[in-house]
Amino acid sequence: MIKVLGLLLGPLSSWVEVSGPIIIFGLYYGFLATLPFGPSKIYSTRSFLLGKPGYGIIAISGSITGQLIGFLSMYYSPIYAALWKPYAITLLVVPYMFFRFFQIMDKPSSSESPHLMNSINNPKALSLFMDGLILQLLNPILLANPVLTRLVNLFLFRYSPNISFMISGLCGWLGGHILLTIFIKWVSFRIDRNSLIDNTLLRRYINRTFSLLILCYCSFYLGRAPLPFLKGKNYEDNNGRSVTMARDDRSVAMARKNRSVAIDPQKLQELIKEEKFFRQQPWPIMCFDHNRVYQPIRYIGNSPFTRLGPVRTEVSQYFFGAYSSDGKKRISFTFLPSVLVLGEKLVGGYRDFLYTSCSSEDPYYRWNHTVKRKRDSLGNEFSDRVKALSHGSPAENVIERRVKFSNSNGDSFTEMYDPFLNGAFRGTINQFESPQMLNDSIISNLSDFIEIFMRDPKEGFPNDPLGYGYHISYLWQELEHESFPLPWEPLPTYTVRSLVPVTISSNPGTPQPKYALNRLKMKKISYLIQTPEIQPPYWLWIAWRSSIIHVPVQVARCYGDIYTNFLVYVYGRFDRLIKPSASGIIRMDAISCLFKKEYLFVYENLCFLFECLAQYEWTILLISRAGIPRDKRYSMEKKDFISLYREILLNEPLQIREIRKHVPRWSSGLMIGEYDDVDPVLLSSNRILSRKVKDTMTFDIGQRRIGVVQNRYSAEADYRRNLIQGSIRAKRRKIMIWKRIQPNVHSLFFLKRKEIPAYPKDYYDTSDSGRVDKEQIGEEVREKIQRVEDPLSQQTIAESLCLTWPELHYFRGLLLMAQSNIRKNIILPSLIIAKNMGRILLFQVPEFYKDWEEMRREMHVICASDGTELSETTFPDKWETQGMQIKLLFPFRLKPWHRSKPQSAKRLRWSYLTTFGLETDIPFGDPTSNLGIFSKFLKPIFKKVKRRLMGSTGIRRVPRVGYIDKSELNDRIQNKLLSETTPMGSANDSSEVNDQFGYETQTINVKDQDDWTTTMKERIESIAIINSSPITGMSLVDSEIHTGSKGSFNILGSTLKKRLVQIRRIPGLFRNKSVQLIRKRFYSIKFFIKRMDRRMDRDLLPSFINFIASNIKFWIQSAWIRSTRNITTIYGRIFIINKDISRINRGKITNYYSINEKIQDFEIRPDRNMFSMSQAYIFHKIWQIRALDIQRILDHEKPQDLKENDWKQWLRCFDRYNLSPQIWSRINPNKCRNIVNKQCTCYEERFVPYEQQEDSIFATVMEPFLGLLRKMNKRYRYDLLSYSYLNSTKDLDILNLTDIPGPPVQPAIPDERDITDREGILKEKFINDIIEEDWKGTDFNIVNGSRSTVDIYDAIRSCDYDHTTSIDRQKKKTDLITNQQGIDETRRENVGIMDSPKIEKRISQLDLNFWLFPELSGIKNIYYETKSKFIPGNSLLREERERKKIEEEERKETTNVLEQIIGIRSNVKNKQVEDGQDKNGQVEDQDGQDQDGQVEDQQTDGKKKTNKGLFQCKVVDVLGKKRFFYLANICRVMSGMKDPGTYLRIQERNIDLSLMAFCIAIQKNSSANKISKELALQRNVRGKVRNDNEIREDKKIMVFQPYRLSSIVDDQFLMYKIVSISLKLKKRAGEWIDGDFYDGSVQRGKILGDEKNIFSSLNLEDILLPKRRREFRILNRFDLENDHVGFSNGKDIQNDEELMGRDQHLSVDTTQIIKRFLWPSYRLEDIICMNRYWFNTNDGSRSAMLRIRMYPLTVN
């Protein structure tokens, strides 16, 4: 039995252990579900109290049933969809609740049976049950803030698959209801037992109380939504523009009394009709009207530059919805999202409610039918046009013409206003979004400009029901409004579109923009008003409006073309009579004569209009008025002005009114708040609930006292957030402001979690113990949390009462002033005297002067309550009730002595004075200990005493660092030794050097320092085993180096092992001595043990270890240096004996010499038969042996038998750095190494990781420069792609030189066409082959024809000159011929490598690294191909001796070579350079004659055809001589680097920023200043050098461009070239169809109007317009229900038999027919869709380039 129980209890216990938390979790949340006390709970409690417990049980049973249905809805979706649809339950239940409400309000009768109802069929019991059920279902909707309900539902949905959670939750929920029932029964029993009132009267009171409670609770569900009560609308005009100036009640009453306005009967009928048909409006408008009064939420300002007042916005105007149009989804303005959701639900479930049809008609049927009809119509029209063309009609009559709008006089609209044009063809109108833009409405325009109520109250206007402004419309009718547009209609684009009124400045001659209006005092200027017709406030407004018009500078900069000139005085420019007064107010007597009825239209409205007009219109206006005498000007005002207005506006082109969406009903110029610098009479019109301003400040400027608003908001919760009075309150949570300065506010629910500060880990000082006291931290954290959790403690409440007590601020201010005077006059002088008297008693020099000077610096500034500084004497306004502060600037600090030099320590430069005379850092803050007079007095004294004690006792200062145990210290020692003792360690190595040398380092991981010797021995033995393989040149070098250094490694390993043992014994010996000392003198030195131990670990040991490490490093370097003797002997023996392997390792030996040619490491000494090599190179070779896997080289049995044709074996045998430059440049030209110079030498202090170079010049200056270069390369790629895309239509069968796009090359020497090579060392065929190989992938073409006008051999020879090995220039004629034969041999041997498909594939790719300097990209491969070919046949040692002889000559010729590369010669030459040039000229003259002879011999042998290339030059900038040489060096060095940034990082200390700017100028000017000249060295037939001034008059940089970027001038030119192809039928007859403006005329096809021959290559779709053509093709591609009706395929039209039969030139131009098929005009039009030309962007970052289908779909 026990075993059975054990078997049963085991799984049960495990299940309980796993499911226990879930069960407890479910019970908790189930019980939590009963806590929301909603209407159902209230109704159940009412039932318990009104009747017997049976009523309450029935009601609570209904509530439980409703909640059970909610639980079941999580598992059964139809129940959830039925219950929780938006407003579905509400629409069904609200009528039921409406009738139940009257039943609840009935008084309970005393005759009701107190007995329990036994049947559920009882109507009373059924109503109770249904009420509880419905109220429970409505609970989530009716509850105002259902946090608990949402929380429970969230967890129920989350854990609904867990049956344990659901069962436990249901149990907890039932338990909660049971407890609730028991509690309510107990309360009901206590009320019945202890009540002293009659039972009937008690039930009546309970019924009335709970009925009101339920009613109020049901009304709370509305939240902050507007109440559904009707309110009166604001008195505003119908067009939505309210009068800006508000009137008080008295003025409004008088205006109504005096107004006699006849109501327009027509408008009255419209209003009645609108009210009559309100109920017949469609569904959304019937319930949701965006023009209702209380719809707007808050204000939004007009612009960021002005504060003219906000603009009311409507929520419903900023929502969009989708609808079907042309089979696609379009967006349009729509209603709120909730309205859309409700409409969809109503349409889906209640179609009868919306009177919608329930037919099963397909919604797309009508659209399909429309599309079919349009397609058939287009097909029929196209067919008729083709038939007319085939019957012989002229093409000009058949081709469709574009329709233009025109008026009755025949004047057509301009392209800007043509509605048929769109996109880039239609002009753009710059419009500044301002509330005062010119509108289409007369009344709205009037309110924008004048915004006043101006009329004659006695006469009135008969047709003005609005009460103002109709006189403009009346006068407009007199001016024949049908002939010309109104002033408020759209103006031309060059007209200023907005006016920003600002007030005048103090100086009337210089208008200045301001952002607020000065407050105008009615009492001061009331005597100026003498006109009884218009009320004084309106005159003031007129004066302000007519004072000045100004545009802020920020606005003018946004639209430079429009706002070129600021607006000045309106009347000052329009009429010179009116001048503002000095006070800035225009006198009314100066302008009263202008504001008569007949001139009101002219001066009040058109002055603003003509102020916006263009310059020439103003010129006409001023000229016309300048000749009129001043006395006759007023009599002629109306007639001349109207005629001038007619003359100007009638000449403007016709325009179409732009569609605008106005903000309805609301005005745009209302006041913001109480302090807006406006007249106090207008304050009653404030319609925005702004935050309460606490106080203001006043300043005395001169003799005037000006009040300025200082926004100080109270620290209490304020919900007045710029809301419109009477509008919807935003649905937001309540917030609590409990801090003095609280930038972020949170809900009360998340307040505690958000505001608890998180202290950092290093907040506590752990320098002494190295450990943190957890108890201390816990105590401090608990204290902080307690402060946060209890913000309303007794102390906080007391402080709050003190701060809010008005009388307290008065007494506090008096105390502050008293403390300030006591501090300045008593305390500080007393302390200064006492301190200096003490110094005198101590026989020290007194410091009275310095102390008095510091005390005078202290300033006491009176501040407002929030700390805003005012002045030293002026008190803030309302300081008696709102408080004040006294701020101490440069507070005085008493010091024991002053330093001779001022200390630049960071200290607090200000503080606030408290009522006790102390200092604090914040207003109303507590005094702090680190602020005060004595804060700087005791600290220096203690510091000096401490230093004296430490000096006398021998104790030194202990660094404040963390404690380090022994294990960590040993690890640091080992890591330090590893990094210092590793030969050529990684700390001195750089990845950049590894990349340049072509190898990767291999890291040796040594776990223990004792294993270092063993590891090195294993490596040496493995290398020795490898060297036992067949000996080659490289393996012999490696083996000899290892043999020579083997002994040094052994000695080094043993020495290191001994030193490590000694180092490890040092801590143990020291601690043993310490223990012995502690045993003898324990009590005397207990205080110093811990400090001495730390000092030993931190100071003594590291210094000793550094000393040992430095010695070890020196010993290691000495060992490496001693081993170099054997290495030099080895190299000398190898190079002399091994002559047979020179051919195999030719690439390596050549590379070896190319390296040392620049750095000059090798030198031949005459007294010794050996080499002398640099130490850096030896270290490099030794370290290379460690990093080299030589076994892979010797895998092949006989590597010396490999030929260059066996390139696969070469690639398999050799590492990357072993390949010859010739082979590697063909395999991967991007990563080949061009040259290695002295800058590759590793120095310890120079090789710092790039990430650590924070303060370097490269990180701050060069990085933006490289980014610009990358963008330029990216731009080049896009240009190249676009040009390749365009040139795909070029004729491939025409290979004439004139077909190469580009500007025509004009030679600098027209008479000298045949220019030969300078030296004649290369055969022309060989050079042409090189050019063809190197220039693949570019736009350069090698043509077979006569000689080109520009010879490229000079550039090839001059560029190759600096990179080839040195050759004796005096023996060129003999040596070079021999070398040429060797080159031809090498050329034949390299055929197998060069012609392989993989190599050809790599050659065809573009070398993107050379885009930085395009002039070098065309010659880099030539350099690699020819460098190893110009090696003499003698030994290498002989070449070295010869190289030293000609070294001096090479330096002299460097200047000429650099000028040949770039194309410039300098006129400034010294004597040495001139001598060198004369000598070179003679040699070149002789070489030129030899070249002529060679050319003649070649021509006699039959080689008369020469392949020449075409170079193109451009002038980019003028450069000095010195900077030019530096630029040439940069070009040469950076051309061979993988990353140009490597050179910039190496030369960051010597970088020339102006030179880098010049490089940027080269790239920026790549599309400008293009000229074509011959190369720099142009010579005549006689071979003489021409004069520099004749060839090059200006010292300009001429850059060679092998990539033909010059054909693309800019983006707009390329776009014009693309579009010009599609516009081929310009005149439709008698002209060429397509003419390429750049490539020359190529016949595409021709339509002759007289003849009747038509080329079949013409695309017949060109008959239609492009827009209709695209529409026709799109409609044909639609598969409308598989119904190919009409012209669904265009092939039938193309195969018109009659038309094709009349074509007599069908097979004339087959190529053109194919091209017309592949590139029809509608395909070329798609090119415009490329984003970088359509959107006018220069890079591809905005959006991806569209993929264009290059071939049309083929229809089978």
Swiss-Prot record:
Tell me which domain of life the UniProt entry assigns to the organism this sequence originates from: Eukaryota
Query: What Pfam families does its record include?
Result: Ycf1
Q: Cite the entry's keywords alphabetically.
A: Chloroplast, Membrane, Plastid, Plastid inner membrane, Protein transport, Transmembrane, Transmembrane helix, Transport
Could you tell me where the Acidic residues compositional bias lies? Answer: 1484-1499
The record's InterPro entries line, in alphabetical order, gives:
TIC214
Keyword DNA repair set for record: no
- Entry GO terms, CC: chloroplast inner membrane
Q: How does it sit in the membrane?
A: Multi-pass membrane protein
Q: Where is the composition biased (Basic and acidic residues)?
A: 1471-1482
Locations listed in the record: Plastid, Chloroplast inner membrane
Q: Which residues cross the membrane?
A: 18-38, 54-74, 79-99, 128-148, 163-183, 210-230
Please name every pair of cysteines joined by a disulfide bond in this record: none
Gene Ontology biological process terms in this record: protein transport
Cite the residue spans of the region called Disordered. Answer: 1469-1504
Describe its assembly.
Answer: Part of the Tic complex.
Query: Which protein family is it in?
Result: Belongs to the TIC214 family.
- What does this gene product do? Involved in protein precursor import into chloroplasts. May be part of an intermediate translocation complex acting as a protein-conducting channel at the inner envelope.
The name this protein goes by in its record: Protein TIC 214
Q: Which organism is it from?
A: Pinus thunbergii (Japanese black pine)
